[in-house]
Amino acid sequence: MSDNKSVLVLKVGGALLQCEMGMSRLMTAAAQMIATGQKVLLVHGGGCLVDEQLTANGKETIKLDGLRVTPEDQIPIVVGALAGTSNKILQAAAAKAGLVSVGMSLGDGNTVHAKIKDERLGLVGEVSPNDATYLNFILDQGWLPICSSIAVSADGLMLNVNADQAATALAKLVNGNLVLLSDVSGVLDGKGQLIASLNKTEIETLVKQGVIEKGMKVKVEAALEVAQWMGKPVQVASWRDAEQLKKLVLGQSVGTQIQP
């Protein structure tokens, strides 16, 4: 594998898992990039599957400021849906595209430090980069790491981590280029038009106006944090058009660029 290209860190949400065509296009694009020597790391959530499993088990989905609250009695269901079902659905899609993938979680290889984020959120974790050895080994083989957002704390707690924040920590760890992919084309203004570029001041204004809210607020704030930390833009774009990803390899902008 070539070391002269930085790692492309792709974060995908749960909605992708319900779209066979979307997964197929994304994995095909990833395979094409890896074939050229581009290292690709996939980080995923799975909120839709978590909600389905909670409902099936008679549990309620609770959110606070766009972040999932994870009570102790829900953590086995959340871990199963994210580190289990969601992760393996993506591995199956990778296999169909001819990729060698490694299914993993934030708890593998001492990759991150994890702690409770906020007692009000229950078993929700906050993670920081720790050791890239395991990830780098996988990437150096030309394999695709597919990482769920489940972490393990030093005192043995299983923690549910917001997938955008998980992707941020891993992008920092491998000094990668982060792309937050969702089922919308990027950040939209009040009229539903795509905004090509945003900086911190513009983001704060749109949050105050209620244009950026809930899940997109979490996504944009995560993107801004990593953009500032790494001194380079982060992309917020759509997995619905995986062809766009090839533009990223060429250094072209897609979706909304969040500026440092």
Curated annotation (Swiss-Prot):
Pathway: Amino-acid biosynthesis; L-arginine biosynthesis; N(2)-acetyl-L-ornithine from L-glutamate: step 2/4. One of its GO terms (biological process) is L-arginine biosynthetic process. Substrate binds at residues 46-47, 68, 160. It is found in: Cytoplasm. Its EC number is 2.7.2.8. Disulfide bonds: none annotated. It is an enzyme of class 2 (transferase). Its main location: cytoplasm. One of its GO terms (molecular function) is ATP binding. The record marks 11, 219 as: Transition state stabilizer. Signal peptide: none annotated. GO terms for cellular component: cytoplasm. It catalyses: N-acetyl-L-glutamate + ATP = N-acetyl-L-glutamyl 5-phosphate + ADP. Keywords: Amino-acid biosynthesis, Arginine biosynthesis, ATP-binding, Cytoplasm, Kinase, Nucleotide-binding, Transferase. InterPro entries: AceGlu_kinase-like_sf, AcgluKinase_fam, ArgB, Asp/Glu/Uridylate_kinase. HAMAP family: ArgB (MF_00082). Belongs to the acetylglutamate kinase family. ArgB subfamily. Catalyzes the ATP-dependent phosphorylation of N-acetyl-L-glutamate. NCBIfam families: argB. This is Acetylglutamate kinase. It comes from Shewanella denitrificans (strain OS217 / ATCC BAA-1090 / DSM 15013). The lineage of its organism: Bacteria, Pseudomonadati, Pseudomonadota, Gammaproteobacteria, Alteromonadales.
